Regions:
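Short beta-strand->alpha-helix linker/helix-N-cap micro-motif
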Residues: 47-51, 77-93
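Bacterial N-terminal signal peptides that target proteins for export
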Residues: 2-16
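Surface-exposed short loop/turn segments
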Residues: 75, 89-136, 140-159
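A structural "domain/chain start" motif
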Residues: 26-69, 75-77, 168, 173, ...
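Individual transmembrane alpha-helices with interfacial aromatic-anchor signatures
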Residues: 156-170
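Bacterial N-terminal signal peptides
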Residues: 15-27
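Short coil/turn motifs at beta-sheet boundaries
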Residues: 39-41, 85, 108-116, 170
Length: 184
């Protein structure tokens, strides 16, 4: 009989562990992909229009729009909608971009750059076309210049592109926090 109770305890322990796992997942807002949209914890729909680039730096609008859309998709507060039927729409414009040397070596060669952007966002209520939020968000990133003598140009371009991606992600994180404060 002790053998039977031992198996029963193991089964109860496994069931209890499974219940705690499911409870903790539900408690932190986890939902199944196929869950209906009217489930508790409904996320707010948000349409993000492609950003415009008012600077001479190419491709910033694509990087910024993609980073923000990815952050929205990953967030637990919002859901990205691609259609014009969304309740709120977000427009953005990259207004300023600057890149300047931050550090020099003993021979006055640049070893580190800093890049800065100022991105203007405007959140609009779709039904009334009334702005809910207008804000300029500043972001910056730093990158090191390669000391290599063979692939210096390629490494510098890769470092700059990585810094631009970090810059776009930093903007997306700041923007997401601002949207959460505004809409929730």
């Amino acid at each position: 009989m002790v053998d039977g109770f031992g198996h029963m305890r193991q089964g109860m322990s496994a069931l209890l562990t499974l219940g705690m796992l499911i409870g903790s997942l539900l408690g932190c807002g986890y939902t199944l992909v196929s869950a209906p949209s009217d489930t508790p914890g409904k996320r707010l729909p948000l349409n993000i229009l492609p950003f415009t680039n008012q600077t001479r730096e190419p491709d910033l609008e694509r990087l910024t729009t993609a980073a923000l859309r990815h952050a929205i998709v990953q967030s637990q507060m919002f859901v990205f909608t691609a259609d014009e039927a969304s309740v709120t729409r977000l427009q953005g414009a990259i207004r300023r971009f600057s890149s300047y040397p931050l550090a020099l070596d003993a021979q006055d060669n640049v070893v580190q750059y800093r890049i800065d952007t100022a991105i203007y966002i405007r959140l609009i209520e779709a039904s009334t076309q009334r702005p809910l939020l207008e804000q300029e968000i500043a972001s910056s990133a730093v990158y090191l210049v390669s000391r290599s003598t063979t692939d210096k140009v390629r490494e510098d371009v890769a470092a700059r592109e990585a810094a631009l991606a970090r810059l776009a992600q930093q903007f997306a994180d700041k923007c997401l926090a601002l949207l959460a404060i505004t809409l929730l």
